[in-house]
Amino acid sequence: MDQKQIEEIVRSVMASMGQDVPQPVAPSTQEGAKPQRAAPTATESCALDLGSAEAKAWIGVENPHRADVLTELRRSTAARVCTGRAGPRPRTQALLRFLADHSRSKDTVLKEVPEEWVKAQGLLEVRSEISDKNRYLTRPDMGRRLSQEAIDALKSQCVMNPDVQVVISDGLSTDAITANYEEILPPLLAGLKQAGLKVGTPFFVRYGRVKIEDQIGELLGAKVVILLVGERPGLGQSESLSCYAVYSPRVTTTVEADRTCISNIHQGGTPPVEAAAVIVDLAKRMLEQKASGINMTR
């Protein structure tokens, strides 16, 4: 079926629907003239930083009918919309952005929180039974238990029997800790103290999993344990932090349903300062109800 037959079918269908039939465009009279192609809404550039705000706002749909609608849609979500297609395939810039975001997510899982950064924050650092990142990824069970050195350090250097114990751990996203720390921990500790609660010594657990907070709470006699841990990164979002709070945790009896989780803490989700206020209120309600997770009443 050639182009002329396709145009005839289109005209006959539109005529049967009572719509105006588009007139065929007359070919150029100049010998050797090439058909002109309308300019796309955005040009692809190899020099563009694929992680920049400009790259994220890029619209790859060529010749849109309502460009303003696409612009508004692009501003309203971080999802991969309005990227356009090249036949059945994604456009080059959309594909490169996808690959760049995937690489960034892998990097943040494999990166380490620098020891210098931990010291600069004035945090006590302890470890789980894990000794390196590779074992952390392959042996999650060992990331749920403190090393003997960590147990000794916590017993000797931390406040015992606090109302609330705050713990920071790298988890699966180093960037989540380093990017959000300054905006969540100071207001969180200040809010807990203003509420009249006895706050334990905050410390950093390297290679920690969520369940490690059960052993910490039992060891220190904490009523509520709040664990701030890096979330598993998504494509292009490597700075998302989670808070796992649990009341009176015990290694042998606490289950996942006993935890209350606040996730997606970062500048593009729940702002860290706002999350700090929510966590303070959550800790107060846990102490009032003496419960957490599904056992709490709303």
UniProtKB/Swiss-Prot annotation:
Cofactor annotation comment: Binds between the large and small subunits.
Gene3D superfamilies for the chain: 6.10.140.690, 6.10.250.2060, Ethanolamine ammonia-lyase light chain (EutC) (3.40.50.11240)
InterPro entries: EutC, EutC_C
Domain of life from the UniProt record: Bacteria
Keyword Lyase found: yes
Stated role: Catalyzes the deamination of various vicinal amino-alcohols to oxo compounds. Allows this organism to utilize ethanolamine as the sole source of nitrogen and carbon in the presence of external vitamin B12.
Protein name (Swiss-Prot/TrEMBL): Ethanolamine ammonia-lyase small subunit
Organism (species): Salmonella arizonae (strain ATCC BAA-731 / CDC346-86 / RSK2980)
Organism lineage string: Bacteria, Pseudomonadati, Pseudomonadota, Gammaproteobacteria, Enterobacterales
Gene that encodes it: eutC
